[in-house]
């Protein structure tokens, strides 16, 4: 079924898993546009309360009877094939559409759609670009994969031709998007439960770049060899960024303050544009900022608005998020779940004025832990001590493929101070016995490891 965002406003649309970050944003866009929306999720949440207050009919729990007088059912890749609502829709011959295709259909209703892709950094880059476009009063519609204070959550409904969204490569989802501007932040090994290897991943990003029209733009990280190759092969306009001089946009004269935030000069094709100080820490965030600046230049946003937007951007929740301080111990939470991200997070922490860094890491999915096992043994060197939790299964089942105990043994064999724990309370009790004033407690992972830090602050 095709879906016309402009014309099909008489349709009732049901979302299976409406409380998810992306699905809730899509539902909000439709509600604001006058559609009748229903949905279901396995638990209540603040996001669901917000949708209810906007007029959505939401059920807690997935049941066949929830599919009632529905014209279209939208679902995500995380929904199993035996989901009762999915089965009911099929039996009733109700049109089905997966989340990525549906998002792509909505994007077609916006002239200037921007799709931010890459293995790492999508949420932060989208957050930065959101702040910049808001500073310039472009009134964008925004879908971001995290909670952003500036827009009061994970979505913003605009009334302009500008549309900003993350574009995930998992199961080739982003190949269903029609971007006017596409960003490729980086290409790394991930989602190896779906992709065969890094070459297949890179080929998928190449296909993504070919979705951009000839008068559109591809923005890419020039220092990433695979991204650079795609920049040279695409048929649209290109704009590159990086630390090397062969990039169109570069950062020079870089300095970091005591909070790990960078100040630097932005150069375009050898010309100094302006000086900027970021409000998010880490060298990797210089690159995210440069990517967002590239898009800003494409849209002729003024330097003043770029500087204002980036200065105001404190990042999304769960992206090196300051949670609080107790007895001189700082608690920070980060979503990092890939070795490259973990390295960047710990490197950022090292730049700050802390005594010792205690890192509690919760691996995310068995397939990722197994596929990147060797890389995981090399990414925690900047932690003074690692507390390793059991693997967070997410969409997977434990088949004995790999365990946190095995990873812990490998890390200890490399000389890292590491202990394994098997519950949030065990992790909490351990760090409470070790932490002293001046230390940093860093909870890392895409699961529910954040609970440990939050409990510590309430102790």
Swiss-Prot record:
Main subcellular localisation: cytoplasm
Protein name: UDP-N-acetylmuramate--L-alanine ligase
SUPFAM superfamilies xrefs: MurCD N-terminal domain, MurD-like peptide ligases, catalytic domain, MurD-like peptide ligases, peptide-binding domain
Compartments it resides in: Cytoplasm
Gene Ontology BP annotations: cell division; cell wall organization; peptidoglycan biosynthetic process; regulation of cell shape
UniProt record similarity statement: Belongs to the MurCDEF family.
GO-annotated molecular function: ATP binding; UDP-N-acetylmuramate-L-alanine ligase activity
Lineage: Bacteria, Bacillati, Bacillota, Clostridia, Eubacteriales
One Gene Ontology CC term in the entry: cytoplasm
Pathways per UniProt: Cell wall biogenesis; peptidoglycan biosynthesis
Annotated EC: 6.3.2.8
Catalytic activity: UDP-N-acetyl-alpha-D-muramate + L-alanine + ATP = UDP-N-acetyl-alpha-D-muramoyl-L-alanine + ADP + phosphate + H(+)
Residue ranges of the TM segments: none
Gene this protein is translated from: murC
